UniProtKB/Swiss-Prot annotation:
<feature type="domain" description="TLDc">
    <location>
        <begin position="283"/>
        <end position="509"/>
    </location>
</feature>
<dbReference type="Pfam" id="PF07534">
    <property type="entry name" value="TLD"/>
</dbReference>
<feature type="region of interest" description="Disordered">
    <location>
        <begin position="1"/>
        <end position="21"/>
    </location>
</feature>
<dbReference type="InterPro" id="IPR006571">
    <property type="entry name" value="TLDc_dom"/>
</dbReference>
<feature type="compositionally biased region" description="Basic and acidic residues">
    <location>
        <begin position="10"/>
        <end position="21"/>
    </location>
</feature>
<comment type="similarity">
    <text>Belongs to the RTC5 family.</text>
</comment>
<dbReference type="GO" id="GO:0006979">
    <property type="term" value="P:response to oxidative stress"/>
</dbReference>
<dbReference type="GO" id="GO:0000329">
    <property type="term" value="C:fungal-type vacuole membrane"/>
</dbReference>
<dbReference type="GO" id="GO:0005634">
    <property type="term" value="C:nucleus"/>
</dbReference>
<dbReference type="GO" id="GO:0032984">
    <property type="term" value="P:protein-containing complex disassembly"/>
</dbReference>
<protein>
    <recommendedName>
        <fullName>Restriction of telomere capping protein 5</fullName>
    </recommendedName>
</protein>
<comment type="function">
    <text>May be involved in a process influencing telomere capping.</text>
</comment>
<keyword id="KW-0963">Cytoplasm</keyword>
Amino acid sequence: MGQTPSVESQESKETKNEMPELKSREDILDFFNNRSLSILLPMEIECFKSRLGDKDLSDPLTKDEFNTLLRIADSNSQLQILLWNFFLKISAFPFLSNRSESMTGFGILKGIILLTRERIKKYLGWSNAKLIKLIFIGLTSQEKVGVKTEASVFKIQHVLDTLDGIDLASSTVKDTDMLSFITWLLLLSVHCPTSNCKLNEKSLYDKWKDYEIVASSMVRSMNKKITTTGKGIGISYSDFSHTIVAVSKNVMSPLENIVEHMLYKQDDLLEFPCLDTFLKETKLMTYPLVAQLCTVLPNEIVMSQLQKLYVGRESGYSMRSLQSKVFNWKAATILLVSGTRIVDDIEYSENKNPRYKRFLEEYPKLKDEDQEMDDCHNLKKKVTFAVYIDEPWRVTNKNYFGEKRTSIIELSPRQDKFNSLKVGSVYFNTIGGGIGIGNNQPVTKLNSVRYAPGNVSLTLDNTLEFGVFRHTGYGGTIGPSELLKKNNEENKAFEIRFLIRDVEVWGCGGEKELEEQLREWKWEEAEAKRRQEINLKTMGEDRALLEMAGIIGQHGQSGGSI
């Protein structure tokens, strides 16, 4: 079998074409500023310029003007400071070790290109791996401002290849800054799902605290020492990038949407059906939780308009009730289960709930001394799991269902993902076996059941009162933790036993519905761009007018892509 190329070798190929040598920092900045203009369409530059009022692209912007461009709330000072510094660093590209002395339209335009996957690929030939590095650098604390590197000749290629000499291995991002950034992205994923949608700025930040709770789970995934943010624990690039790639691959998509939002005029923005128009929140399925699911699952989540099938609080906690509500749905579903971790089995079964004692007799639990629980699992009591099942439910007292895309997702206290390794990982057992994901079928007799948990599995008893998540590594139908694989800890053994508080099942649209929705959105975006072109032409003869207005063509020769 062939060898998979390393990230380093791939990145070296991306920028293999040598760049010119220039004699000053200012020349290099001008070079990349002008290159950014060549990547953008004239109509996009004109639309962005219209948002600056009477200012030129090279004029400094105030913090208030910057906040208006990015729709940052006046009340959120921490986010304002974080994003201001973030864009000052990005706008200094390629000199990332020092942030710009001022924020300009040129700097923001360059940021738009650098923070979108397709544009940065055209601009520099960089992959998503380099984009993640760039975002991480923007989030790091940086005290140096406008420090000029002493050199007689700058080799641009060397500056690009070394990211201006930044040592990523020793860089960290504050947990509080990461929490604000992830909270912002989650909020935008619901309110800014496309780059050309209208934003309701009055209510945009109303539920910030709710989104922050969800974001906390994602931040805990980036450093297992973090249980509560604000204790000064740093997040390394290695942990940050692994978390993004392994368990939250879509989390940066809203960043692309909000920066490209600046390339549309207000009149060209389209009404987009917000979640509150078709989703009535429940105890579990809230807008913040939908945002979290969107970071890890396919686009079916929001695009297909989730359908409430079963809510235990409304229909009663029973297998029969769940079956009557769910089994007629002929597409993918999301099972949500949340509860409180049972810390002391003996104390709880003898003093609080004698039914739990019987469950322990039926479920062969791991011994406490054989477990390695991370701090977030030891110290946090609330647990929430989602199971994405890409096949209709059915009674399976002997067999199994669930295609290869079935997966277990831990949503709290941290975010993690456990992927199906083979077809058939779910059972719905109506003769006392309950619901199992990753298990073997339980052995059921007249008045007893014996569960057979898999190495990685989620078990719900037949009364929907108790649940257990088990992790012991490879060997079953569900694969081990995507997070733990990074440090070769995929065989770490732990078990989360919990009292179920809520169970819900939600239907996702089928592939046909999703494809239709995607086609509609692409058509609407194309129409918006077409209207932009028409509006631009009504101003006069296209590019000539832009040059006369000083928008393009007066800042040197534009470069091509690398």
